[in-house]
From Swiss-Prot:
Gene: CCDC89
Protein family membership: Belongs to the CCDC89 family.
Name of the molecule in the record: Coiled-coil domain-containing protein 89
Residues carrying Phosphothreonine: T16
InterPro entries tied to this protein: CCDC89-like (IPR043450)
GO CC list: cytoplasm; nucleus
Keyword Lipid metabolism assigned: no
Compositionally skewed regions (Basic and acidic residues) per UniProt: 19-32
Subunit structure: Interacts with HEY1.
Subcellular location: Cytoplasm; Nucleus
Coiled coil: 20-351
PANTHER family in alphabetical order: COILED-COIL DOMAIN-CONTAINING PROTEIN 89
Keywords in alphabetical order: Coiled coil, Cytoplasm, Nucleus, Phosphoprotein
Domain of life: Eukaryota
Length: 374
């Protein structure tokens, strides 16, 4: 009985792949996406270089400086966008892992419930055997007392009837022999019942030990899974910190670029025609940036909707098993991941707002340059 039960318990674990393999597959997909974005950025740089080759040397030098700065800004924006997408995808992977762990937890709870019912049945059977054993002991004691009384009466009758009833005495002796034979048979049956009770008790203890070992193994697997989730959460926190540092560096570069642009405005009157052409080109670049920002906003809205759907599904599943401590721990972890994601989203929105402010300032400068031109 125990061997097929263990095979049934181990069967679903062999079918489902471990969460580490899924994380490796997701990381490979992310690396492929990063390589594709890098190739696209290189193509854009090549097109920009081809456009610069058709200009004069002075225009190339100045436009190359501005173009390099604008490309650095666009590269930083692309890097930050790619990092935010990676964080979103890893959050989704963790949510999927949490759902799988909850399903495994439900399966393990059902198995433990079945094992508890089986142990309860064994205990009930053991109690019935113990009650039967006590009844047999009482019957044996009563039979011994009756046998002693009969022997005493037999002795009295034998003494009284030794001289009177020899034939009756022989009959009584035959009855006594029959009773002794019956007593011996009953004692043999009692000994066999005792041995059976002892064997059943040993089997029940062995099964209880096996159940306890299975419970300890399942507890070890649950602790390992929680440690893996904690390590993944720590890596996500580190990546979030790196993204925050990169955003701060990008803001510093933006501030330095704005200072350089203000210094450059003092020499604008000497280079009116060239600056008009530059303003037109920069207007095109700004339109491209606005299109990229709109695409980022659409992707962020889609990711938010997917996250809301996943959270609603997770909450519906968590309501059914809210009494379990494991689900509460997972809920706390998901809340921490959600909080980190909200912070990263707020920082990305602040960075987007800052970039929009810089773009509006550049537009104002372009308008002023157009007014200065004849």
């Amino acid at each position: 009985m125990r061997a097929p039960m263990l095979q049934k318990q181990q069967a679903p674990r062999m079918d489902t792949p471990p969460p580490e393999e899924r994380l490796e597959k997701q990381n490979e997909k992310l690396n492929n996406q990063e390589e594709e974005t890098e190739f696209k950025e290189l193509d854009g740089l090549r097109e920009a270089l081809a456009n610069l080759r058709g200009l004069s040397e002075e225009e190339r030098s100045e436009k190359a400086m501005l173009r390099s700065r604008i490309e650095e800004q666009s590269q930083l924006i692309c890097i930050l966008k790619r990092r935010s997408d990676e964080a979103l995808e890893r959050c989704q992977i963790l949510e999927l892992l949490n759902a799988e762990l909850e399903e495994k937890m439900m399966q393990e709870a059902e198995k433990l419930k079945a094992q508890g019912e089986y142990s309860r049945k064994l205990e009930e059977r053991f109690m019935t055997l113990a009650a039967n054993h006590e009844l047999m002991l009482r019957f044996k004691d009563e039979y011994k007392s009756e046998n002693i009384k009969l022997r005493e009466e037999n002795e009295k009758l034998r003494l009284e009837n030794s001289s009177l009833f020899s034939q009756a005495l022989k009959d009584e002796e035959a009855k006594v022999l029959q009773l002794t034979v019956r007593c011996e048979a009953l004692t043999g049956e009692l000994e066999t019942l005792k041995e059976r009770c002892a064997q059943d008790a040993c089997q029940a203890q062995a099964r209880e030990k096996e159940l306890l070992e299975l419970q300890s193994q399942q507890a070890c697997t649950h602790t390992k899974e929680t440690e893996q989730l904690r390590s993944q959460l720590q890596t996500l926190k580190q990546q979030h910190q790196q993204a925050v540092e990169q955003i701060a560096k990008a803001e510093e570069t933006h501030s330095s670029l704005s200072q350089e642009l203000q210094a450059r405005l003092q020499t604008v009157t000497r280079e009116k025609e060239e600056l008009l052409q530059l303003s037109i080109e920069r207007g095109k670049v700004l339109q491209n940036k606005q299109a990229e920002i709109c695409q980022l906003e659409e992707k962020l809205e889609i990711a938010n909707e997917d996250r809301k759907h996943a959270l609603e599904r997770f909450e519906q599943e968590a309501v059914a098993v809210d009494s379990n401590l494991r689900v509460r721990e997972l809920q706390r972890k998901v809340d921490g991941i959600q909080k980190a994601y909200d912070e990263l989203r707020l920082q990305s929105e602040a960075f987007k707002k800052h970039s929009l402010d810089l773009l509006s300032k550049e537009r104002e400068l372009n308008g002023k340059l157009r007014h200065l031109s004849p």
